[in-house]
């Protein structure tokens, strides 16, 4: 059974056996966040919430409960067992090196996310993420500071660019690249890979390549004396300190100037672009292969929801959604087939997951703007709006299904708003 078929099986048949088949870490996290709902009868649940039935005189982690009120005591509309929908970067260990750190949320931590893995990385000013390449595409969003990125095309042409908060880059699979923190305080960024099981240890590092090649072969290949490579690192560098580089123009000249310049643009100014959709409730900025041609396998949206606003009810027919919460507080309900639904809470630095075709909304439950990223292992961003569907069907059909008459139907927004 391939990955897509296994995911579809989990969604369509969210059985106890599927749930118990997940890793022990995921099960612990799921229990920790209250992400598995027991079947509830709405009337019984509503009555229980008003009497002594929901009291908990025993032990509790109040700080955690305060962050996850809907995860612990879900609304009565929740029902059944579902796949894990939540994790947090604050629960995973940091790999700390001189020059920065990294940590990851992958399929191991969030087993339902088979298509995407995420990393959060920090580089101090001048420090490098070692020159490397890997088997997955790398899509990144800058959360803080500034960085310089380089990537070489297979034809030998080079792209060099500087990025800052709100910008992104894409490195295609197999293309060698590097990242360096700039002044005054380096950078922090989110990395998204289109392989759910991708690992920070699964990259091909320049230092390791050189260390594992016979010196005489390196000499023959490069034309350098074999003794030159005696000073090469014997251990992986991965993240290591360096000196803040000079100007971007100087680096471009140093590598060969226009003669070796890439025809392709690998960076994009996402936060500063005009919103794709905007309303009183917030905005959505979409980036995919249509406006960023280099990003052929990863699409994304930067969503801002005002207090009390709502990322409208919708679903994605072409890909599962991997979310990263940058700021604010939110709750999300995800609807699954066979009468299953689950509501979970999110805070900054959390990760959310929604299987393809699962209906959901994201509501701002805080008093500041909610800011998050939606990412997809796809070339295009595609979503289906519930409101738009309800307005497009004949009024008699809507009346027959939901008892909404024609006059009431006219009050539903006719166009896809993105945020309400």
Show the residue positions of the predicted features.
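Glycine- and acidic-residue-biased ligand/ion/polar-headgroup-sensing regions
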Residues: 135-154, 316-337
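Short histidine-centered beta-strand/loop micro-motifs
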Residues: 129-134, 160-161, 180-181, 312-317, ...
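Histidine-centered metal-chelating micro-motifs
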Residues: 128-130, 148, 168-169, 173-178, ...
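N-terminal secretory signal peptides
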Residues: 1-18, 25-33, 38-41
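A short, N-terminal "cap"/entry segment at the start of jelly-roll beta-barrel domains
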Residues: 41-117, 217-306, 312, 388, ...
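Conserved short histidine dyad/triad with adjacent acidic residue
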Residues: 119-134, 301-316
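Ligand-binding loop in jelly-roll beta-barrel domains
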Residues: 173-200, 356-382
